[in-house]
Amino acid sequence: MEGHVYWTDDEVWAIRRAYLDGSGAQTLINTKINDPDDIAVNWVARSLYWTHTGTEHIEVTCLNSTSHKILVSEDMDEPRAIALHPEMGLTYWIDWGENPEIKRANLDRQELRVLVNASLGWPNGLALDLQEGKLYWGDAKTDKIEAISVDETKRQTLLKDKLPHIFRFTLLGDFIYWTAWQHHSIKRVHKVKANRDVIIDQLPDLMGLKAVNVDKVVGTNPHADRNGGAATCASSRPTQPGLAAPSRAWNC
C-alpha cells in the first residue's frame, strides 16, 4: 500500500512498515500490542487490521494514525490469520483453540458468524480469492489446503498429502504460496490444476508471507467523495455483543 510493506514485530510488540526497498522503516503502533500475530491492509479505506493472540482481539487503525480500536473482542480464543474483502466489506479470520473455527464479520463490526468449525486441526494460513469467490486455508495438523466458497455453499480440498506444518499463506494470480516450517522453504500450488513446486529452499525460521500485484488495485471507497477525496474509517452501531461500540469516524 503506497509503496510500503507492513509487518508485526513480536519481539518489541509493535506494528511497523518500510518502503519496498527497505528504507524508511518506522513504527506505526507500539502501545497495547500484546503478541500481534497477523495483519491485513484494507487498500480501499486505507486502514490496517491485525489479530492479537495475547489479548484475544482483532483491532484496526488508519494508515496515517497511531490510534486504534478494538473490532472484535468476545468469543475469541486465539485469533490468528486474517484476510479482508474490502469491496464486500468483510473480514475473515482463524480462531485457534480447543475448537478451531474460521469466522467472518462485516468491516463495520456487524454480523459476526462462523463459516467453518468442523474437521479443523491447526488452521494457519488464510487467503481470499476475490475473482473466484473462494476462501483458502492451510491446516498444519491435517496437512491439507482447503477452500470454501464465500457464499458458504461448497467446501473442497485442494491438497491433502506431504504438507508438513503449513504456516503462513498467500495467493497471487493462479497460485497459492505458503511457508513450510519443517522443510525450511516457500512452496506454491496451482489453485486449479493442484500441481506444486518449491520456490525457495533452505530458509530457516520462515514466518509471514504475502504476495501482491502492486499494479492492480480493485475497489473504491464510497466515503472518499464525501470527504474531499480522503478515505474515512467509519464506525457504526453493532448488532451483536462483543463487537466494537459506536464512535465518531476518523479520517485516514
Curated annotation (Swiss-Prot):
| Span list, region Disordered | 223-247
UniProt name for this protein: Low-density lipoprotein receptor-related protein 5-like protein
SMART domains associated with the record: LY
Q: Where are the LDL-receptor class B repeats?
A: 3-45, 46-88, 89-132, 133-175, 176-218
- What organism is recorded for this protein? Homo sapiens (Human)
Which keywords, in A-to-Z order, does the entry hold? Repeat
One Pfam match, given by its short name, reads Ldl_recept_b
